[in-house]
């Protein structure tokens, strides 16, 4: 239930859907399995295992999930069958098979195999935080995050969401914090970072499980490298990697949050309810503090 990586989008809090409206709209775009000659199928599915509902509400949060099912048809399988058919035609009819005919044969083979192909599925989850006005997506890959945002917009007929563009870049802030040897506010340096230089061949330095205030680490910044990833700890509650794209990776929710969730959840539903609220509130509060050190949002 706890997101391990996050992309997020600021939302217009005045135009967020109610839980029942969101559920009705998502029902019109519900997931169905791949049929016949379809290569993939995509739609909304239940975000929790103990309920068939398409929206899991918890106080000021709404959880949704997008499922994608894809046919798995290895190119090598198609190629082998095609070669067999081409050889059969050449032997039986004593003629060559041209490029156009090979393409037609390939399409016929694909159409024949698709209905019987294996499938693989994946899902992307997101939580609406209606109190803070954020959409938190459980994926740091921009393509995956933007895809669920697009599907939500299509289902709702629009959703006012923007990219998290701040006045100062995350890379600039991270570089400054590493250079000065400490962070601001509730943030502390952890033990991992990545730095990049400039030039035709960009040098990359990865630091893992080391003291980030050590001279040999700081010297990379003094030599002109910028920080692209930085391990941080926020108020002894969350440890994470901040990236230059303003995504969060390798998120760890420390004991204080885990214990609070467990104390408020007597069963699977109760634990999911408490965990969702605590995750959304702590992450959103942390993001707001981080945004303040980044100079606020761009106009």
Curated annotation (Swiss-Prot):
Localization per record: Cytoplasm, Nucleoid
Biological process per Gene Ontology, one example term: DNA recombination
UniProt keyword Metal-binding present: no
Record's keyword annotation contains S-adenosyl-L-methionine: no
Disruption phenotype: Mutations affect pilin antigenic variation; some mutations create growth defects.
GO cellular component: cytoplasm; nucleoid
Keyword annotations of the record: Cytoplasm, DNA recombination
Main location: cytoplasm
One Pfam family, short name: RdgC
Family, as annotated: Belongs to the RdgC family.
Physiological role: May be involved in recombination.
Protein's name in the database: Recombination-associated protein RdgC
Organism: Neisseria gonorrhoeae (strain ATCC 700825 / FA 1090)
Taxonomic placement: Bacteria, Pseudomonadati, Pseudomonadota, Betaproteobacteria, Neisseriales
